[in-house]
Curated annotation (Swiss-Prot):
Enzyme class: hydrolase
CDD domains to which the protein is assigned, alphabetical: Gal_Rha_Lectin_BGal (cd22842)
Reactions the enzyme catalyzes: Hydrolysis of terminal non-reducing beta-D-galactose residues in beta-D-galactosides
Biological processes per GO annotation: carbohydrate metabolic process
Cellular-component GO terms for this entry: apoplast
Protein's name according to its UniProt entry: Beta-galactosidase 7
Expression across tissues: Expressed in flowers.
Gene: BGAL7
Localisation: Secreted, Extracellular space, Apoplast
Family in the record: Belongs to the glycosyl hydrolase 35 family.
Secretion signal span: 1-25
Domain of life: Eukaryota
Known glycosylation sites: N154, N254, N351, N380, N491, N665, N706, N797, N801
Enzyme Commission code(s) on record: 3.2.1.23
Length: 826
């Protein structure tokens, strides 16, 4: 009896433990309408924040701002080459601590979407693949290749195991509600033929076997193998419909802006157009949407891909590179999220009916037993509309969506922005004058003697030699010439067929010149005249520089990098041209630069005694600079102005803040003074900063700095520049503007700084834009500037009711809609 009683108690104990465990778990599934959480259909709003593109100290603030902006989830890729830089040697430290990042999301009360890939694209170096993978025998990426599949499965399994061990999947009570395998393979699958289909089937089976207890995604993958869920990526996904009728309409990448390339302009996507794309998606049946990016961040070190992706990955996201609110985008979307959430039951359970109102205007009605919710969408790119709907008139601007949660009152219109615009600026304090020391890069052995670390017959691709350990690779060979050589003449050139992103050439220790890629032409011919060849042995030294490895396209891993030849000397004798191909000569190779290998950027560098503090050179190639500075006071984000420098890399206290290239200006054409949000967006539309450096300012995370005492900035200058203008600043809100519509409330804030003055205010039909507002033909009879000043000046934030009650009668305006234009100084 005692034994039987004990067995019964033990059984009850295990049942209790199991019940408690299940109570903590979250059941994530889906039907044809939506992702379901614990059996309930959900509207889910997500945003991409990539943990390596910020610092661990920044994560809580970024995630909380995303939550305050109305998001339910944070999405991130997992970056294979960052975590496994050498085969079976892993790094999950610092800002690579993905487990800590997911737990930080959980601590904020948000869900997580984990896109393991492990191909990520993401404008990340080599698409996230480690280069050692490429250098394995018989390797082909993203196809039926046993070596690749084994390595992909190994890394994917490791990440899943790490998440399971920390109980981070929703099925274990964690925040991860969705995971992704592969990435945008549908864009390239046709290039791989039957093996592409077999590979994607294998991916699905492999992922499914890992038993994570939440759905798997495959983005941009029509007819994704079951049970994978296909999703859409793009600027607009309202016209997208899943090929599988049991899959909900999901959008994994709504591109909030675009990335920047060196030599390119700054992309800009308006808040109106981004909100329009979101509202259209939910109007047409979407229920899951993710912003790519919600915070773009910074490509620290050498992680930027492309080639030619800049260090800044700001992406014109709702949170800027430094973590500040990008207004009005952040606030305008927050208001939309609030309205959409109020309609969640209608959007996920309601019967859908659609009415074509003509002239590209459509209404959509979601009806439940409790009531109805409506959208009125105007996709006409030029004409505003006065729409009569259910017996009422609604003004729906061109290229906008009006949202009516009760099918009666307009709660939101995507083109009617009632959120402030924040103009960020550098603080006005006088910059600290930096005292620089310098030393040359020790390159004489390569330039004069052609001496390297390894020797090969013929030219070898840069990736194969460096394993991506460095941006730099020396190619060096020798050539014997005598007077009788048919090549010899007074008119000779060095000709190089190159795939180097930047090429520097030396002959017999003399600099011949350089060439770098422009306009995306990464296959080019370099040819320069050489006057210093000698009878006897001649040394030719070529420095190949990579600026991020290709990250997208079919078979992108096999794209050439470096100097693939031919390399030749060309002699011109009258009409006769004689060419001597050196490609199959014996070549010496030297990986990296000596200063990198000696870690001159480290604060513990043993070469500190060799730095000079006299006769600071400017315009000198291959030069190291170093200076001490004090961290700017306060908590605002810190930036360093590298104007005056050429190209290179910068470190703060030994930590790389990325590549710099402020001497590379964008073209002078393609920018407009006015940006019209109407009409389909592309990365060139509304671009700005023509004729200016693609990137002048570089992010210095506060966690890289010593708050008290000295800090060290180290620069490696590749092309030649002047460091005397380098200075540190903080980024603050300088001006706040708003152009709010009547019958709304506008919230105004200088982001933790007091509002100091009202520069302009007018209620009626004000003209112009932020920085150039003017009084229109009518305005309220109360002094708008005094009214706003009373409400706002001296405060950190204020709320202004945009109405005639606040600003007085506007009889002169007639029946036309009234607006408040206001500009505040911080």
């Amino acid at each position: 009896m005692k034994m039987k009683h004990f067995t019964r108690l033990l059984s009850l104990f295990f049942i209790l433990i199991t019940s408690l465990s299940l109570a903590k778990s979250t059941i994530v599934s889906h039907d044809e309408r939506a992702i379901t959480i614990n059996g309930k259909r959900r509207i889910l709003l997500s945003g991409s924040i990539h943990y390596p593109r910020s610092t661990a100290d920044m994560w809580p603030d970024l995630i909380n701002k995303a939550k305050d902006g109305g998001l339910d989830a944070i999405e991130t890729y997992v970056f294979w080459n960052a975590h496994e830089p050498k085969r079976r040697e892993y790094d999950f430290s610092g800002n690579l601590d993905v487990v800590r990042f997911i737990k930080t999301i959980q601590d904020a009360g948000l869900y997580s979407v984990l896109r393991i890939g492990p191909y990520v694209c993401a404008e990340w170096n080599y698409g996230g693949f480690p280069v050692w993978l490429h250098n394995m025998p018989n390797m082909k990426f993203r196809t039926v290749n046993p070596s690749f599949m084994n390595e992909m499965q190994n890394f994917t399994t490791k990440i899943v195991k790490m998440m399971k061990e920390e109980k981070l999947f929703a099925s274990q009570g964690g925040p991860i509600i969705l995971a992704q395998i592969e990435n945008e393979y549908g864009n390239v699958i046709s290039s791989y033929g039957a093996e592409g289909k077999a590979y994607i089937d294998w991916c699905a089976n492999m992922a499914n076997s890992l038993d994570i207890g939440v759905p798997w995604l495959m983005c941009q993958q029509p007819n994704a193998p079951q049970p994978m869920l296909e999703t859409c990526n793009g600027f607009y996904c309202d016209q997208y419909e899943p090929t599988n009728p049991s899959t909900p309409k999901m959008w994994t990448e709504n591109w909030t802006g675009w990335f920047k390339n060196w030599g390119g302009k700054h992309p800009y996507r308006t808040a109106e157009d981004l909100a329009f794309s979101v509202a259209r998606f939910f109007q047409t049946g979407g229920t899951f949407q993710n912003y790519y990016m919600y915070h773009g961040g910074t490509n620290f070190g050498r992680v930027a891909g492309g080639p030619y992706i800049t260090t800044s990955y700001d992406y014109h996201a709702p949170l800027d590179e430094f973590g500040n609110l990008n207004q009005p985008k952040w606030g305008h979307l927050k208001q939309l999220h609030t309205v959409l959430k109020s309609m969640e039951k209608s959007l996920t359970y309601g019967n859908i009916s659609r009415i074509d109102l003509g002239n590209s205007i459509k209404a959509t009605i979601y009806t439940t037993k409790e009531g109805s919710s409506c959208f009125i969408g105007n996709v006409n790119a030029t004409a505003d509309a006065l729409v009569n709907f259910k017996g009422k008139d609604y003004h729906v601007p061109a290229w906008s969506v009006s949202v009516l949660p009760d099918c009666d009152k307009e709660a939101y219109n995507t083109a009617k922005v009632n959120t402030q615009t924040s103009i960020m600026t550098e603080d006005s304090s006088k910059p600290e004058r930096l005292e620089w020391t310098w030393r040359p890069e020790s390159a004489q052995k390569m330039i004069l003697k052609g001496s390297g670390d390894l020797i090969a017959k013929g030219l070898v691709d840069q990736k194969d030699v460096t394993n991506d350990a460095s941006d730099y690779l020396w190619y060096m060979t020798r050539l014997h010439l005598d007077k009788k050589d048919p090549l010899w003449s007074r008119n000779m050139t060095l000709r190089v067929h190159s795939n180097a992103h930047v090429l520097h050439a030396y002959v017999n220790g003399k600099y011949v010149g350089n060439q770098f890629v422009k306009d995306g032409k990464f296959d080019y011919r370099f040819e320069r005249k050489v006057n210093h060849l000698v009878h006897g042995t001649n040394h030719i030294s070529l420095l190949s520089v990579s600026v991020g490895l290709q990250n997208y396209g079919p078979f992108f891993e096999s794209g050439p990098t470096g100097i693939n030849g031919p390399v030749s000397l060309v002699g011109y004798k009258g009409e006769e041209t004689i060419e001597k191909d050196l490609s199959q000569h014996q070549w010496d190779y030297k990986i990296g630069l000596n200063g990198y290998n000696d870690k001159l950027f480290s604060i513990k560098s043993v070469g500190h005694q060799k730095w000079a503090n006299e006769k600071l050179p400017t315009g000198r190639m291959l030069t190291w600079y170093k200076a001490k500075f004090k961290a700017p006071l306060g908590k605002e984000p810190v930036i360093v102005d590298l104007n005056g420098l050429g190209k290179g890399e910068a470190w703060i206290n030994g930590q790389s803040i990325g590549r710099y290239w402020p001497s590379f200006n964008s073209s002078d054409d393609g920018c407009k003074d006015e940006c019209d949000y109407r009409g389909a967006y592309g990365s060139d539309k509304c671009a700005f900063m023509c004729g200016k450096p693609t990137q002048r300012w570089y992010h210095v995370p506060r966690s890289f700095l010593n708050a008290s005492g000295h800090n060290t900035i180290t620069l490696f200058e590749e092309m030649g520049g002047n460091p005397s203008m380098v200075n540190f600043k903080t980024v603050v809100v300088g001006t706040v503007c708003a152009r709010a519509h009547e019958h709304n409330k506008v919230e105004l804030s200088c982001h933790n700084r007091p509002i100091s003055a009202v520069k302009f205010a007018s209620f009626g039909n004000p003209l112009g834009h932020c920085g150039s507002f003017a009084v229109g033909t009518c305005q309220g009879d109360k002094d708008a500037a005094k009214t706003v000043a009373k409400e706002c000046v001296g405060k950190l934030n204020c709320t202004v009711n945009v109405s005639s009650d606040t600003f007085g009668s506007t009889l002169d305006c007639g029946d036309s809609p009234k607006k408040l234009a206001v500009e505040l100084e911080c």
